[in-house]
């Protein structure tokens, strides 16, 4: 009997275990359903397509994935060739003859940055800098093999390189690569330690100086390649550096007892973020196949520790974090005390004030090695204004014609830059001495050839913002000077030119009356949708005082002012700066209660789930955002459907088959497709980083690059992979500090250059069907503490609007795409038509806070981006909102968010029933669908079409698993029943036998 009982227990245990196992699998699958749909999607079925229409809206050029990859690699090479920037070329050291014999020095010549910190040696099809040179020149294989045997640069180069020194006599030239890399969560170090005498991570290191010294002593000519998105201190390249002797002996400023022979360094080229084909591009430039035409996108300061941002970059923690709504009792902050004076805006203004004897102790030449916009060529160019520029009063726009002439002996491309100087009154609105107004790049010009390029400058982009007094944009009266420049410092030369020469390079316009962009006479700025007034008083402006109002460490930020640069120079936080005491800030970090009356201003329940129209999403392609047709279409969605689309936006945006909405897939990143569970085939993972794109100063090329991204998505589909619709890029944050960990994802220190390039690149990508989630809005200029409860970013509203928001403004206002869509003719027949629509299709918000409020729920989203700029794109979070912490999903929804970068259900969205919640759910869903309708996900889907999907394979496997387990459990149950039945029978028999035995004993 015990054996049978044991069998029942065993079988019951097995059956129970199988049920528990399958239940666990079911729960896990339910939680990860979106990810499983990414990996194992069902097939799309399109039905009811109207009138035999094919729905081929996008004209793709590629016919295969291989063709798309080749196109992408060619575009990457072209971008690098136009963006790499020649910064030094003494004695015409470059170009080199193709017969030059080259020794390549530096481990990172073969392990350079393509974009961020990726190593090309680990990427199929990539050409490292070293490999590119080896493909072009005869290179020293002994040295190459030596570096192949190690995994870093040599601490003592001489001790290692002496082993192959016997080969040097055959080689005249050494090419040395210096690299810096950073990445997400990884800023450049402000101090790399005592062993390096506490120099920064962007200062040349001891072993690098030793390597350059070794190269100078063993080769006739040394070429330096700078492979870094972060601006390094490059004083060692400057013969006029205070630490450089006349004969090229350099004294290390961090170790004054050490000197190095750098006399043979004759040329240097910036090659940061050069993409998968950067090696080929570099080799083509070095031998003159390509004439370099890139220009620097940042100012190269001689000593970064003296930059205005240096004292307020890094880790600063509130001492009363435990009192706040803080994860692990940690809340951090960053103070943008420098205000508008970022990059060249500081250095050029400081130079002017010093020249006027208003800034003692500042010397431009000892502060700046290479100015913003600087770049050399193998030829020379002359620029001059051609005719008088025009000013369009209605559109408040200047139009310039610039004649660019190749005055040298080889073909090349020239860049014209125009900087605007606005009138400044001491003590008035802060103004940089010059700001970039516009730029243009020529075609390839032969020697002696000229081209006239058009440069348009919108007044809106250099108008000042007065956050203190008028609390709006202000155009002061006075003289406005437009400098036709080679770089940001050209104004200093032009001011001293003869009248004849000055007329070629300087245009001045007098504005007799100030414009206050809120009064009845002036109204809003021309490009704005509504009047712009202070939106950030509670989040930002309250935190700022004048430099002489109070004392350092009083808990406020003291404005850096041109009126007294020296005494107002930024300082590090101290004292009460580390205490969050203001009630406005405390309210912003407090837990958000979605049920408070103030958070539910809408009382009338919006329409949902109405009788269906005949519209599907294909009918909405090409329909303007404000068209009433959208109201009819949106009213037919259920709340559940809208919640699903809003809450599941992580790499996989959900479908609504009933309303003709297909599912779509999104991918990282700004420089190539990164999988995240998507089916990505053999793509060009590493395009050039955004700084390299910006360095081309070529918006036409940027648009072609965006188109190439779209072609690759289509190519991936042709190969059986995912059709990518959304990309988490490009990057529009500002190079506030050289130490920013993600500078490789962002274009520049200048918002006009960044905004123009982003608008062009997004326009190209969107025309090929992509939704570009430009990231990270806003103030994500450092990585330190970014994900630790989101650091609080404090910047006054003037700097926020003029520096950190302007790139986004230009992207929203200027990015355009031409789409194809079906319209009806006079007979009611569908005809394919063309239309220009906004290409600012998406934005990704940030982890950090704007002020003390999470940036993903900032007042700036609705108040500035939508209300003022007219933004109609889809806004997605950077990762998901989190319940009861600072990334609050309900607040994000109410502030203009449209998607959460999660795929795990509602993820903290508590309110899905109130009128306010449903109103904003409809608004969010409309933004999602408006941009989907004009994307590649509609390719092949004509008006009237319905979309459905076969069941995902993983669900079939799950159901099959349940069937198998169910069958096994059923069999198990039968066996248990049989055993139990048999046991009962045996028991009955035993009882009967026992009973019979007793009778026999009694008789």
Across the structure, where does each feature detected by a protein language model lie?
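Terminal connector regions
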Residues: 459-527
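Glycoside hydrolase catalytic-domain context in secreted enzymes
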Residues: 1-466, 474-483, 488, 532-1003
